[in-house]
């Protein structure tokens, strides 16, 4: 007797169609398309996780630059001054200070200016 494997193939199809729920049009109803776009969605998710790191770094730099210019110094000068003064603070923390605790940020700016001789 021939074994057709109906249960397993139905289970596999159900897995992809369930995952593709919410996709537009035929992508959520046709197995072949649902499987292709399910795999594609994994690629998008992988790329997105890498992109997120770039996006956040860009956001932090923008925030630091805006706050630094309010204090009369450029972003690049601030970072260089902090390196010269031996302050080891990352951009995420610096951006958080610029937004939430501006007085503490001003102290870091003063340290950078002092190291640069401004």
UniProtKB/Swiss-Prot annotation:
GO terms for molecular function: rRNA binding; structural constituent of ribosome. PROSITE patterns: RIBOSOMAL_L20. Keywords: Ribonucleoprotein, Ribosomal protein, RNA-binding, rRNA-binding. One of its GO terms (biological process) is translation. One of its GO terms (cellular component) is ribonucleoprotein complex. CDD domains: Ribosomal_L20 (cd07026). It comes from the Bacteria. Binds directly to 23S ribosomal RNA and is necessary for the in vitro assembly process of the 50S ribosomal subunit. It is not involved in the protein synthesizing functions of that subunit. Belongs to the bacterial ribosomal protein bL20 family. HAMAP family: Ribosomal_bL20. This is Large ribosomal subunit protein bL20. It comes from Kosmotoga olearia (strain ATCC BAA-1733 / DSM 21960 / TBF 19.5.1). The gene is rplT.
């Amino acid at each position: 007797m021939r074994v057709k494997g109906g249960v397993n193939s139905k289970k596999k199809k159900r897995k992809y169609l369930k995952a593709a729920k919410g996709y537009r049009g035929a992508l959520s109803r046709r197995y072949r398309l649902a499987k292709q776009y399910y795999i594609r969605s994994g690629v998008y998710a992988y790329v997105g996780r890498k992109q997120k790191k770039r996006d956040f770094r860009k956001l932090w730099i923008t925030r630091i630059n805006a706050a630094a210019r309010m204090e009369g110094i450029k972003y690049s000068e601030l970072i260089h001054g902090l390196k010269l003064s031996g302050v080891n603070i990352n951009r995420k923390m610096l951006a958080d200070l610029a937004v939430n605790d501006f007085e503490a940020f001003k102290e870091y700016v003063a340290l950078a200016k002092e190291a640069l001789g401004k």
